[in-house]
Amino acid sequence: MSIGENIRRLREQRKMTQEQAAEKLGVSFQAVSSWERDEYKPDTDKLIRLAEVFDVSVSAIVEEKSNRFKTKETIYNWEHMRTYVKTTAKNFKMKNTLKAVDYAIEAHEGQKRKRSNVPYIYHPLNLACHALAMDINEDEIIAACLLHDVVEDCGRTLEELPVNDETRELVRLMTFVEEKGEDRESALQRYYEGLAGNPKAALIKCLDRCNNLTTMSWGLSRKRIYRMITETDKYYPELLQVVKDTPEYNSAAWLLKYQIESTVDIYKRLM
């Protein structure tokens, strides 16, 4: 693709008009139009500004790639995952999970994953299926996987959740809250210390990070991706060790460590 085609593609991906892009760049929309038609090329200063506005590297604008890989927003159908979780929950008599599935679907109704048309419920269902695929079928863990974002993102309270106290406690630990007067780093330190004190919560958080790492390339800005990488490097070795030191989760720890660290390493090489 030419520079002009790259500019147009990046602009359209961010749902900007030429006028909106021009305003952010400090140029006329005619200038943006001429770049996209390849009549003129932006100078170096404008290329740098374009990269900032689109939150990409300069090379993403100037590189001419004749072939682009087709990518997927999802791998599995969320309704199929729901059926799998429900069927498994019935077979293992997982009462909390059966209640949590429908509650989570209703709570997240209408929500989408960042910068996509993927229903948000895909994310908690992914965590539940990931755990079940590793032969983790503890009722409270699967239920908490499904409900882990409803307090933080849906305005629900712990008391409203249709599950037992242990599941509510896992959801509480998974819910990130910045207390009044607390800076983000202090809040994160307190949050991860709480997770590390509970092996089940540590396991769920590692499942959560696995899914978020695999989707952040299209859901987050480069700045947020960098923050996600540094946060993972800082806090997840301890969580993974907690999971590994819990005999019933030892095998799962190997898989989680491999997925988290290999995915982070790929991003580091490409950033």
Please provide the spans of the model-predicted regions.
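Short basic helix-loop element that most often maps to the first helix and adjoining turn
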Residues: E5-K24
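Short coil turns linking two alpha-helices in DNA-binding domains
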Residues: T17, S28-A31, D43, S57
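Recognition helix of helix-turn-helix/homeodomain-like DNA-binding domains
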Residues: L25-K41, E63-S66
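DNA major-groove recognition helix of helix-turn-helix/homeodomain DNA-binding modules
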Residues: G26, D45-A60
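Active-site helical microenvironments for divalent-metal-assisted chemistry
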Residues: K70-M271
